[in-house]
Amino acid sequence: RLEIGASTGPGGTVMPVVLAEFQQRHPGVHIALSVSDTQRVVEQVARRELELGVVGAARRHRGVVFEPFFRDEVVLAVPRGHGFADRSVTLDELKDEPLVLMQEGAGVRQVIDDELREAGVRLRDLDVRLELGLQESARSAVLGGFGVTFISRSAIDADVEAGTIAVARVDGLEPSREISLVRSVGRAETRVAQAFVEFAKSRLQ
């Protein structure tokens, strides 16, 4: 049995797919994935309620260790047929576009805040219409034509392939984030957990 926790970003996009593929290769293994906020995942790993955690922000905690797991590309998602679709746009163009943002504290939001600050742009300079708590909600808003959003590429891969969402690049921004693996300090890892980490790293590189 493998009990693993993930924050809402990777927990709603990458991890279900990787865990399902791992389970197909190891049909005798029962896998339980719980999805919650980063702090709760870290605390559960520290208390050894979960064997592993996967989070988008490494927050210091003396009961756990963080290690790089994979890089998550953040892109600007736009509705099909949008004027930004499949091209590079300037920050000035972005300022005039209705924007859907992840709520404050979300990993993707922090990445975008940092990138914009480095480019000399403040969020209040943009036309923010909605702030949402889940990447799935932001994806739905784009699908509904309510605006554009910065989102993990992995959250919209299927939509891009289906042609329902397109991707744009923003000149001067190269947003990505490190997704971290969380382990409990001093805990001997099971063979199943070791096998999963090895499989996931090879799958996500």
PLM feature segments, named:
Residues R1-G5, G53, A77, V100, ...:
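Short, well-ordered beta-strand segments
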Residues R1-R62, L132:
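Central regulatory/effector-binding core of bacterial HTH transcription factors
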Residues P10, V14, G53, A168-Q205:
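A late-sequence structural motif
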Residues H61-P68, D72, E136-V185:
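Beta-alpha-beta core module
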Residues A57-A58, R80, G105, R153-A155:
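Short secondary-structure boundary segments
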Residues P98-G120, E189-A193, V197:
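Secondary-structure junction motif
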Residues H61-V100, E104, R191:
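Flexible hinge/capping segments at coil-to-helix
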Residues D37-V42, A46-L50, V55-G56, V111-D113, ...:
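Hydrophobic hinge/microswitch elements
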